[in-house]
């Protein structure tokens, strides 16, 4: 490698947490995924906060929260402001994931980490790409190109290929799946041969995966036994990723008459179920060849489900007849409708709970997977209830004070606007106050008259101030006021009101009432719940198994391998296997959390800063696509560089934690003090944190002219004799090969010695010097 390649792990190494890594390619820094775990760990945010000012671009691989969950917080709260790249489905389905996650949390707790506006602001920054679309970066990223390739795990899931100057090839491939499924094709990593660096995960490195046919039979058997026993089936799934595979599978089973499931109900329950299905209908071209052919030949959209009912709340689900199979989010059972249904159904032995996803350790779903024999567990019951009594009165009083304060602020703003427009108002003659009719078109002031010297027998206008409301308009006409077009809400019938008050439908389950416009509070209590329902884990994660991962890496033959996201024993197993396959041809790294891996293969590559005075004195020679120059200078290690572009003298960085730091006497001039203040204003008063993030880059200064040593000329870009022959012929010099020697005008011989150098022989004549000059022109001489 001729580039500096470094990877800093912010989260998701030696564990199964969210994925977030900082990749440095020379001066450009990529953030590979921006995930957040189910518990919204602060450690991930703290790690991200230290590097957020360095990030130049974000690459998102999958739409689920483990890959992009922290993006709204990073954009809304940390100030992340850079280009974000993702495929079109990751953009659309990622929004669905985050909307559903926010609403699931908000329904039962006071969730304030991010809002729906933060989600929209973050996704507005995403540049949407198609598979195999090459994007050439600009600015600091000049010479870099990124290409998204299909990963086969979720719709739009991406393997990122990063290429530097057409030579260095970096592949970021996590959570990929090489097997073809109902709704997705598998990935084809074998096409990426001999990348310079491969970054992959070890999540499934030691996992033995049952065959797909066996898993489908297990699912069908479980569903049939439960439904025929008059029980309900809860399948915990994600919002808009792997749920599409299960929805396709179950809808196909329901269509099969032999299965006998047509009499039972099938439902999809999450906060955005309708939008997920609608987006899926418009993204068939991103799916498997089988679904594409079905859509093209039969003109039948595969996501036009016949048996799957779409539900947005427990009230919708209550209208679906029992027994039923429900696909509910979230897969971790930490929040959402899946948790609500689990609490309701787990104490009935007739029911069945099917888990399809190994979530992060510490979640309820992972606890049930790892401890299948546990029948009693403590669960925190959270819900949102209406305010009543004294709490409601206090809330109303607070809201009243807020409205009064807002009204006063609005009045003060209007007063400022009126005073600024007073000069404009005085120029216009007041119209009658009774004339307030609005027109469909912009009308000139009707009835307005200009005052004149002569008395007019017309109706006089009021003499007291009667300002008319100024109609605001832009280049499109009058500005529309939304309140003028609001439709009055239809009054609910007495029957509907009674249903809402009772909160029951068909005598089954309590309806979830819309509490968005009602003052509420969140309450929680921890209870011990006995699990009597059957709990089963069936793998529908859509990842490659351990043996396949090892074979794929062996076929790719990467020069360097960085293993992330997986338990330590799985990472160790994958590393040993790859070393056994590749031997000395592969370097394997298993970084720890917050560790920086230097994947630069060339050990003698360093970054230096050149003074302007030195650059202006250089004499460049062109060699192919590059320009070369000889430099005589001296290194100065006193200057520290921070990626914001603000430079500090080394002596000004006071870090008490580093006792061994070299003490350098820095000039205490006013400019240095100003620079230090600028750094504090950018990063706050935490000087220790600043010192940790400061990277020392030496500065190369020019030598005084009398100290510059001489050097022998260096000849670079050595030509081939056949090419030099063509140059001589173009200049009118006869040249031909005789025994491997190029003879020119029968007077000068050009030969290549055993050491590979080119020698010139012949009598000292005009042709000799002319041929020598032409030969020199073929070199870059510095």
Curated annotation (Swiss-Prot):
Please state where this protein is localized.
Nucleus
Gene Ontology molecular-function annotations: RNA binding
Q: Residues annotated as region Disordered? A: 407-449
Q: State the protein's name.
A: Cleavage and polyadenylation specificity factor subunit 2
According to the UniProt record, one GO cellular component term is: glutamatergic synapse
Coiled-coil segments? none
Q: How far does the signal peptide extend, from start to end residue?
A: none
* SUPFAM superfamilies per the UniProt record, alphabetical: Metallo-hydrolase/oxidoreductase
Alphabetized, the UniProt keywords read: mRNA processing, Nucleus, Phosphoprotein, RNA-binding
Biased composition (Basic and acidic residues) is annotated at 407-416, 439-449
General function of this protein: Component of the cleavage and polyadenylation specificity factor (CPSF) complex that play a key role in pre-mRNA 3'-end formation, recognizing the AAUAAA signal sequence and interacting with poly(A) polymerase and other factors to bring about cleavage and poly(A) addition. Involved in the histone 3' end pre-mRNA processing.
Q: How does it assemble?
A: Component of the cleavage and polyadenylation specificity factor (CPSF) complex, composed of CPSF1, CPSF2, CPSF3, CPSF4 and FIP1L1. Interacts with CPSF3, CSTF2 and SYMPK. Interacts with ZC3H3.
Q: Name one GO biological process term.
A: mRNA 3'-end processing by stem-loop binding and cleavage
In terms of InterPro entries, this protein maps to:
Beta_Casp, CPSF2, Cpsf2_C, CPSF2_MBL, Metallo-B-lactamas, RibonucZ/Hydroxyglut_hydro, RMMBL
Q: Which Pfam families match?
A: Beta-Casp (PF10996), CPSF100_C (PF13299), Lactamase_B_6 (PF16661), RMMBL (PF07521)
Composition skew (Acidic residues), residue ranges: 417-430
Q: Which residues carry this modification: Phosphoserine?
A: 419-420, 423, 660
Gene name for this UniProt entry: Cpsf2
- Species name: Mus musculus
Family classification: Belongs to the metallo-beta-lactamase superfamily. RNA-metabolizing metallo-beta-lactamase-like family. CPSF2/YSH1 subfamily.
Q: What domain of life is recorded for the organism?
A: Eukaryota
């Amino acid at each position: 490698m001729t580039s500096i390649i470094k990877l800093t792990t912010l989260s998701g190494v030696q564990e199964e947490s969210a994925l977030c890594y900082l990749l440095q390619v020379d001066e450009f820094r990529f953030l590979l995924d921006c995930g957040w775990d189910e518990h919204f760990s602060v450690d991930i945010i703290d790690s991200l906060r230290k590097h957020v000012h360095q990030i130049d671009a974000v690459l998102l691989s999958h739409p689920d929260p483990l890959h992009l969950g922290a993006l709204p917080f990073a954009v809304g709260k940390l100030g992340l402001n850079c280009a974000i790249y993702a495929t079109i489905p990751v953009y659309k389905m990622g929004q669905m994931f985050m909307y559903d996650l926010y609403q699931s949390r908000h329904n039962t707790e006071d969730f304030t980490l991010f809002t729906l506006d933060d989600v929209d602001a973050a996704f507005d920054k995403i540049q949407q790409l198609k598979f195999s679309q090459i994007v050439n970066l600009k600015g600091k990223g000049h010479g870099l190109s990124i290409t998204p390739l299909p990963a086969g795990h979720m719709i739009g899931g991406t393997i990122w290929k990063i290429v530097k100057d057409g030579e260095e090839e970096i592949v970021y491939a996590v959570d990929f799946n090489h097997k073809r499924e109902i709704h997705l094709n598998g990935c084809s990593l074998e096409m990426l041969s001999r990348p310079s660096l491969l970054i992959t995960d070890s999540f499934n490195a030691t996992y033995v995966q049952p065959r797909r046919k066996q898993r489908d039979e297990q699912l069908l058997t479980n569903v049939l036994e439960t439904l025929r026993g008059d029980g309900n089936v809860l399948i915990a799934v994600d919002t808009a990723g792997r749920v599409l595979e299960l929805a396709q599978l179950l809808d196909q089973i329901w269509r099969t008459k032999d299965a006998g499931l047509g009499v039972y109900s099938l439902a999809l329950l999450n906060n955005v179920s309708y939008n997920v299905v609608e987006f899926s209908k418009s993204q068939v071209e991103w799916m498997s060849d089988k679904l594409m052919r079905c859509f093209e030949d039969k003109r039948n959209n595969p996501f036009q489900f016949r048996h799957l009912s779409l539900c947005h709340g427990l009230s919708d689900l209550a209208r679906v007849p029992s027994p039923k199979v429900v696909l509910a989010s979230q897969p971790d059972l930490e929040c959402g409708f899946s948790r609500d249904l689990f609490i309701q159904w787990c104490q009935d032995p007739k029911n069945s709970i099917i888990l399809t996803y190994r979530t992060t350790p510490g979640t309820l779903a992972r606890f049930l997977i790892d401890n299948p024999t546990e029948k009693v567990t403590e669960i925190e019951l959270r819900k949102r209830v209406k305010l009543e009594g004294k709490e409601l009165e206090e809330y109303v009083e607070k809201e009243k004070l807020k409205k009064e304060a807002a009204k006063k602020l609005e009045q003060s703003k209007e007063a400022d606007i009126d005073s600024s427009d007073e000069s404009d108002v005085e120029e216009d003659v007041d119209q009658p106050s009774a004339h307030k009719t609005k027109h469909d078109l912009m009308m000139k002031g009707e009835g307005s008259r200009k005052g004149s010297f002569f008395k007019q027998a017309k109706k006089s206008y009021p003499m007291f101030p009667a300002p008319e409301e100024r109609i605001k308009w832009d280049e499109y006409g009058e500005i529309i006021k939304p309140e003028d077009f609001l439709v009055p809400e239809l009054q609910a019938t007495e029957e509907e009101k009674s249903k809402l008050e009772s909160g029951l439908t068909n005598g089954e389950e309590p309806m979830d009432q819309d509490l968005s416009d009602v003052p509420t509070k969140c309450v929680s209590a921890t209870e011990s719940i006995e699990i009597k329902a059957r709990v089963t884990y069936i793998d529908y994660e859509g990842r490659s198994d351990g043996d396949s991962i090892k074979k794929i890496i062996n076929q790719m033959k990467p020069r360097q391998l960085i293993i992330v996201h997986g338990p330590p024993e799985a990472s160790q197993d994958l590393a040993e296997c790859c070393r056994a396959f590749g031997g000395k041809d592969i370097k394997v790294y298993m970084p720890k959390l917050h560790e920086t891996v230097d994947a630069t293969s060339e050990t003698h590559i360093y970054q230096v800063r050149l003074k302007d005075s030195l650059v202006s004195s250089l004499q460049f020679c062109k060699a192919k696509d590059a320009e070369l120059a000889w430099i005589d200078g001296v290194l100065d290690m006193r200057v520290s560089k921070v990626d914001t572009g603000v430079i500090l003298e080394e002596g000004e960085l006071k870090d008490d934690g580093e006792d061994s730091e070299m003490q350098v006497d820095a000039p205490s001039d006013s400019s240095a003090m100003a620079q230090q203040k600028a750094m504090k204003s950018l990063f706050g008063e935490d000087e220790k944190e600043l010192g940790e993030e400061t990277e020392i880059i030496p500065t190369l200064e020019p030598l005084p002219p009398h100290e510059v040593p001489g050097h022998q000329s260096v000849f670079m870009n050595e030509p081939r004799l056949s090419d030099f022959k063509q140059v001589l012929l173009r200049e009118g010099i006869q040249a031909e090969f005789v025994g491997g020697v190029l003879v020119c005008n029968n007077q000068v011989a050009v030969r290549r010695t055993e050491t590979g150098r080119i020698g010139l022989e012949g009598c000292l004549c005009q042709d000799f010097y002319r041929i020598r000059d032409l030969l020199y022109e073929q070199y870059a001489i510095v």
